[in-house]
């Protein structure tokens, strides 16, 4: 148990082959196909998957022409479902497409006849961004480590290091922290959970041994592991049936994994399958940009940013900043709010232009998290120079 001066917090991650993540990637692959030849495409694409079936449905208005079947099958192939013996096969799965055009009621209220800068929010809602200085990524340690384990399992499987490893996998990490007046200090890794799909012909003993050698040790700094760290490696004892055969998948089923692993807050709106006129996505990216900029510039050790919108209205209804009491240099949260408002234009059209969100960059956001990644296309991860 953690001492009275410390706390335990847990985050989870899933591989790109988890059925919900498969659906996220299919939805975003379709979004990218739309944006590739029509940057102003309006896309709201949902995906569902189950044994031998992928269904995409929603509303899309685009000038792009592409083969839905090809996009979906290539995405499923990249994810790793290449043979029916592992529960799903991109070559033979049934694909259903039920796509209509965007509602004209939404179009007239949001973008028709309006300049880019005056673009209205695509819906109402509230979105959050979070940042913390506990890792170089300015992300929570629990989330970083859980994600790193999934990334490593993808490397191991793609490089055929463990022949028995199959695509579906989940991780979970509990970290013991010390809270120093709102600043979180990671002390040690308390518990590690890994569940990975496997072939019939491998023993649990072999799975646990090899996960420790090939996944955990290469992924986690040694100083965070100690003799008291608890490991639950394939604790169910059997995980042969996985992917959509094991459970149904839906777009937006892993919104906490997509963001901050349970830290901060979440407005409830998923990201994948939505073009940037949907503030569920674009404003959440902007809120992360603000939070990371505040922390990276040393104005706070932690930051939570909330923005809210009404459909068809370009300016946000509210902006909120909470530093958890960690504002630096004698500043207050009110000071950080003023700095945020003076440095960031949170109208949807300005967010889209500043972060170049009309590019086809979204499929790769749909696995291993939208935040804390070193990718030059993810402009919301580049701290802005702040004037104050």
Swiss-Prot record:
Entry keyword annotation includes Metal-binding: yes
Record's catalysed reaction(s): L-methionine + ATP + H2O = S-adenosyl-L-methionine + phosphate + diphosphate
Residues annotated as binding K(+): 46
EC number: 2.5.1.6
Protein name as it appears in the record: S-adenosylmethionine synthase
Function description: Catalyzes the formation of S-adenosylmethionine from methionine and ATP. The reaction comprises two steps that are both catalyzed by the same enzyme: formation of S-adenosylmethionine (AdoMet) and triphosphate, and subsequent hydrolysis of the triphosphate.
Annotated gene: metK
The family this protein is said to belong to: Belongs to the AdoMet synthase family.
One Pfam family this sequence matches: S-AdoMet_synt_M
Cofactor note: Binds 2 magnesium ions per subunit. The magnesium ions interact primarily with the substrate.
Organism classification: Eukaryota, Amoebozoa, Discosea, Longamoebia, Centramoebida
Keyword terms: ATP-binding, Magnesium, Metal-binding, Nucleotide-binding, One-carbon metabolism, Potassium, Transferase
SUPFAM superfamilies linked: S-adenosylmethionine synthetase
Cofactor(s), names only, from the UniProt record: Mg(2+); K(+)
């Amino acid at each position: 148990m953690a001492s009275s001066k410390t706390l335990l917090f847990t985050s989870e991650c899933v591989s790109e082959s988890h059925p919900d993540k498969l659906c996220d990637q299919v939805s975003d692959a379709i979004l990218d196909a739309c944006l590739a030849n029509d940057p102003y495409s309006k896309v709201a694409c949902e995906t569902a998957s189950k044994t031998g079936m992928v269904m995409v449905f929603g509303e899309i208005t685009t000038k792009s022409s592409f083969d839905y079947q090809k996009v979906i099958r290539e995405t499923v192939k990249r994810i790793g479902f290449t043979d029916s013996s592992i529960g799903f096969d991109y070559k033979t799965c049934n694909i259903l497409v039920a796509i209509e055009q965007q509602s004209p009621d939404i179009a007239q209220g949001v973008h028709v006849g309006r300049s880019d800068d005056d673009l209205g929010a695509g819906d109402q809602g509230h979105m959050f961004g979070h940042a913390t200085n506990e890792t170089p990524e300015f992300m929570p340690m629990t989330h970083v480590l859980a994600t790193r384990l999934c990334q490593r399992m993808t490397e191991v499987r793609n490089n055929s290091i463990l022949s028995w490893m199959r695509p579906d996998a989940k991780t979970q990490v509990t970290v013991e922290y010390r809270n120093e007046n709102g600043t979180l200090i990671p002390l040690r890794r308390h518990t590690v959970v890994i569940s990975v799909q496997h072939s019939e012909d491998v023993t649990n003993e072999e799975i646990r041994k090899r996960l420790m050698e090939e996944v955990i040790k290469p992924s986690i700094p040694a100083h965070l592991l100690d003799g008291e760290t608890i490991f639950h490696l394939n604790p169910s004892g059997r995980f042969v049936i996985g992917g959509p055969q094991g459970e149904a998948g839906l777009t937006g089923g892993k919104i906490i994994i997509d963001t901050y692993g349970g830290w901060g807050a979440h407005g409830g709106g998923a990201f994948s399958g939505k073009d940037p006129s949907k503030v569920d996505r674009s404003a959440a990216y902007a809120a992360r940009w603000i939070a990371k900029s505040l922390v990276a510039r040393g104005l706070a050790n932690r930051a939570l940013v909330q923005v809210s919108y009404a459909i068809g209205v370009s300016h946000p209804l509210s902006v909120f900043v909470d530093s958890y009491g960690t504002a630096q240099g004698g500043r207050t949260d009110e000071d950080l709010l003023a700095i945020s408002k003076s440095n960031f234009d949170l109208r949807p059209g300005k967010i889209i232009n500043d972060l170049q969100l009309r590019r086809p960059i979204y499929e790769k956001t749909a696995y291993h998290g939208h935040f804390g990644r070193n990718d030059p296309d993810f402009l919301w991860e580049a701290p802005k120079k702040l004037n104050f």
